Amino acid sequence: MNPTYDEILKANSLRGNEIKKTPLIHSPTFSDLTNSEVYLKAEFRQKTGSFKIRGAYYKIKSLSEEDKKFGVVAASAGNHAQGVALASSLENISCTIVMPKNASPAKVAATRGYGAKVILEGINYDESYSKAKEIAKETGATIVQAFDDPQIIAAQGVIGLEILEDLPDVEEIYLPIGGGGLAAGTVIAIKEKNPNVKVIGVQSKSFPSMYESVKQNVRTLTGGDRTIADGISVKMPGEITFDIIKNMIDEIVLVDDDEITKAMFLLMERM
């Protein structure tokens, strides 16, 4: 079942003090380069360093007391892993995270630092997720999906509410796409409040799964071995996220690793 705008409002009301409302930061450099006014949504200011804590916290907070007894399991290249690990720690439940073997050592260490048991399996999200499903079947743990879950999507969609609150006259919003949870939730929130805002997804050329799926109007398996944008190295988009994005997003563009790297350095040097 696809998440609704009301579910996004509910996620916003239940986020508590652990989830920050992050600011929009004006970027003079990118504004000059694009001849427009560019703002960056500072999700790196969340405790785990990314927006992923939003969905993980709301999902785990919503589990029944019975489900919490069996703990949770998740697959992630790093950001979702840290979000699930921290949220589990806050709720005092056991947590197992399956991460790709090529995951960032810093992200692996951070995930363990939040108290999770980490298993390294596979070379991308999809292979790690297969292992997570095995663990869930064996232990009864709840799988906290990285993107294809109505509650996860709804909580990520709160970002859209915050953008419109801080910048009501926004004209275009660019969102990274891996599995599509952030883009799906945000586009629901944005289009409900202002359907005239153009929402554009951005995906790695190495893992163009959502781009190809929307293009062919069917979920499509794609992807190489790796990309510098390891957090969006997803070979197959989710069922729910695909259905939302194909019907609501305005456009998806692809960028290669060279373009991503140059943008990263430019951000660090001249944001």
Model-predicted segments: where are they?
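PLP-dependent amino-acid enzyme catalytic core
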Residues: 1-271
